[in-house]
Amino acid sequence: MNRLPSSASALACSAHALNLIEKRTLDHEEMKALNREVIEYFKEHVNPGFLEYRKSVTAGGDYGAVEWQAGGLNTLVDTQGEEFIDCLGGFGIFNVGHRNPVVVSAVQNQLAKQPLHSQELLDPLRAMLAKTLAALTPGKLKYSFFCNSGTESVEAALKLAKAYQSPRGKFTFIATSGAFHGKSLGALSATAKSTFRKPFMPLLPGFRHVPFGNIEAMRTALNECKKTGDDVAAVILEPIQGEGGVILPPPGYLTAVRKLCDEFGALMILDEVQTGMGRTGKMFACEHENVQPDILCLAKALGGGVMPIGATIATEEVFSVLFDNPFLHTTTFGGNPLACAAALATINVLLEQNLPAQAEQKGDMLLDGFRQLAREYPDLVQEARGKGMLMAIEFVDNEIGYNFASEMFRQRVLVAGTLNNAKTIRIEPPLTLTIEQCELVIKAARKALAAMRVSVEEA
């Protein structure tokens, strides 16, 4: 039987939510009630699958904890009042921490002035952010298209490459095995995990995948495409594969890919949605090899953990294909004043506080600690790897990875697996994590592994 719409029910639900938003604090009973409501509504109206997924990190196998607010700059508080050091960072959005006061203030000030733009008049913050990114990004990157997410930034990059290369008879894209570029149709065609791809086959034609980090495989693919007339429009890469398991290519790989792109007349698209904004110890990961892409994709941390925003930045030569008709690719909310205010404030914080350098220093400290633990627990840990504050601990199998996340949860440290590699737990904290908190994370990991070893021995 079809359910009839109920304005009264919708009004009551929205009023209840607004009441919760307005409250600074909730008492114990209100927290318990909220926890029950959230679990019920996820099951009935969001997706019950998320509840099972969250089980993997919850003490006692219960449904996932319900977060309620940020604690400090680097912590989260759940509805039970428990505070967690955030070593997941919202999959890389909290580079400048939770509720960074500079970012929050910029958004609040803009909110009081003008939340959204008219779509007809020129909006100043979009212009200022584009100018800022032109100054900040490497090489000849000059023009920016703004959107709302990493997937959208990749879609824009693919369309831009198509528009530029189609008159040249080049239509093929080369991506890499293990890549993750998003889940919309175009981005998914470049993504390499079958679990995400198969339900939506056939995807866009013209995409090929080669092993990541293998420059000879890349050369062979470019050659074969040329021989068959399927000339390559662009190569799309992550400098470090984030969702693939924090996979670092061999030194010099990006430089070699850049040379191949130049040799074959292919554009180089770098997806720095996860590696950008200081995460790896440089503002952009491509700067470790001084590589200059033709198109750069940003999102996640660009909004400072306060507003969603993505950006696709390209050289003038490439971007000029949109000059005659700027409406070929647009989005209603892309580049809105609130998002641009957040991005401008985020860039200001990253530069003023030199957070990329801090990411390198604290990342080295954490990675040294994790590698020591890998040596102490070779029966559980295969490897610890990473660059800056993008790290991974790879376990011998998926179950051990899940158990580690659950044990870390008990130690009040939030971690999670990567989307393409379930036995790999990512460590991706805010770049603002303190030295003391770094030490606490290493201690928590040591306790977690010790508890896991006891559990294995008793089994």
Swiss-Prot record:
UniProt keyword terms in alphabetical order: Aminotransferase, Pyridoxal phosphate, Transferase
**Biological process (GO), any one:** L-lysine catabolic process
User: What Pfam family is a match for this entry?
Assistant: Aminotran_3
Q: Where does pyridoxal 5'-phosphate bind?
A: G150, T151, Q274, T332
Q: E.C. number, please?
A: 2.6.1.82, 2.6.1.29
Q: Which reaction does it catalyse?
A: an alkane-alpha,omega-diamine + 2-oxoglutarate = an omega-aminoaldehyde + L-glutamate; putrescine + 2-oxoglutarate = 1-pyrroline + L-glutamate + H2O; cadaverine + 2-oxoglutarate = 5-aminopentanal + L-glutamate
Question: N6-(pyridoxal phosphate)lysine is carried by which residues?
Answer: K300
Cofactor(s) of this protein: pyridoxal 5'-phosphate
| CDD domains in the cross-refs | OAT_like
Which GO MF terms are attached to this record?
diamine transaminase activity; identical protein binding; putrescine--2-oxoglutarate transaminase activity; pyridoxal phosphate binding
| PROSITE patterns in the cross-refs | AA_TRANSFER_CLASS_3 (PS00600)
Q: In which pathway does it act?
A: Amine and polyamine degradation; putrescine degradation; 4-aminobutanal from putrescine (transaminase route): step 1/1
What superkingdom does the record give?
A: Bacteria
List, alphabetically, the PANTHER family matched. Answer: AMINOTRANSFERASE CLASS III, PUTRESCINE AMINOTRANSFERASE
What family does this chain come from, according to its entry? Belongs to the class-III pyridoxal-phosphate-dependent aminotransferase family. Putrescine aminotransferase subfamily.
Q: What does this protein do?
A: Catalyzes the aminotransferase reaction from putrescine to 2-oxoglutarate, leading to glutamate and 4-aminobutanal, which spontaneously cyclizes to form 1-pyrroline. This is the first step in one of two pathways for putrescine degradation, where putrescine is converted into 4-aminobutanoate (gamma-aminobutyrate or GABA) via 4-aminobutanal. Also functions as a cadaverine transaminase in a a L-lysine degradation pathway to succinate that proceeds via cadaverine, glutarate and L-2-hydroxyglutarate.
Q: What is this protein called?
A: Putrescine aminotransferase
